[in-house]
């Protein structure tokens, strides 16, 4: 069976995602579409607006298989996110990875990926790091502000291509042009497509604009409970106050004395966004800081970080997805394709289980990795 993989967050699922899946399948002539999706915390450095089970159900309206991306991937840099996602795709024997981009020129993106790999090994790169500049700024400067680097999806696409070249040369890659909405659009401005940011804003504001930009047959899923950063902050504040400076120093992505900034500013902070602004330095982007804070919330240490894939958690599958999974188990009998978590296999998913428990503690929801069987229908 020919497969196409999509590296996703679906925060939440919308018409643009549906278009991406359908185009990916069409352009690759794939028999099965596999969505590799972030769990309850996403790359923006925040909790997903809906839990992973609801979002997997949304995705199953169009995709055939939904696989959970390791939690630490979503709370890492773009390169580590891409590396683990590509390794999951390889574990799933994906033939082609299809990603969305504003550029849509795969040749240009591959050339940029090669150039960035060379830049990262240069003395100029090391010098600019010592000057305290952020990674995105350094790359932009050394590539003479290449216009393709102005859009986040192009940047992430380049990370996928770098990871494929390094870890899974057997996987092909294609780019699909994003339609209409831009990644950071804060308001819904189109009758069919909108950014995830604008849809989340609409949902949180409790208006009905999001109705126009999500698939009609799954709109009932968008009235389920959702979670925001405002709900997270009291728990985060408690965690930072309760932890020692030394303990904060040992949290994943906390470096160069940042634990002292956390301690210095937490008592005066009144909300999440105020706190993040107070922590900002020229070395770190806002997104990096937010991911760091989620690592503090989840108490993720460097030793917890996944580097290789030893098992994957199947969140959702339809009949075609089930058939593909059966095929994989025949071809790779030694691999762990887990559809239901229990005591015998829970050790593979320690971070994901903990993230779900903390997400539930804050949101008041009850679905866990143990009481929620693999999703097989979305209606």
From Swiss-Prot:
Recorded catalytic activity of this chain's protein: cytidine(34) in elongator tRNA(Met) + acetate + ATP = N(4)-acetylcytidine(34) in elongator tRNA(Met) + AMP + diphosphate
Class of the enzyme per the UniProt entry, highest EC level: ligase
Record has Transmembrane as a keyword: no
Predominant localisation class: cytoplasm
Subcellular compartments: Cytoplasm
Pfam families according to UniProt: HIGH_NTase1
Binding site for ATP: 7-20, 100, 153, 178
Keywords from the named record: ATP-binding, Cytoplasm, Ligase, Nucleotide-binding, RNA-binding, tRNA processing, tRNA-binding
Gene Ontology cellular-component terms listed: cytoplasm
Gene3D superfamilies documented for this protein: HUPs (3.40.50.620)
Key word RNA-binding present: yes
Family label: Belongs to the TmcAL family.
Function: Catalyzes the formation of N(4)-acetylcytidine (ac(4)C) at the wobble position of elongator tRNA(Met), using acetate and ATP as substrates. First activates an acetate ion to form acetyladenylate (Ac-AMP) and then transfers the acetyl group to tRNA to form ac(4)C34.
UniProt xrefs under PANTHER family: TRNA(MET) CYTIDINE ACETATE LIGASE (PTHR37825:SF1)
Protein name from the UniProt record: tRNA(Met) cytidine acetate ligase
Species assigned in the record: Staphylococcus aureus (strain MRSA252)
Gene for this chain: tmcAL
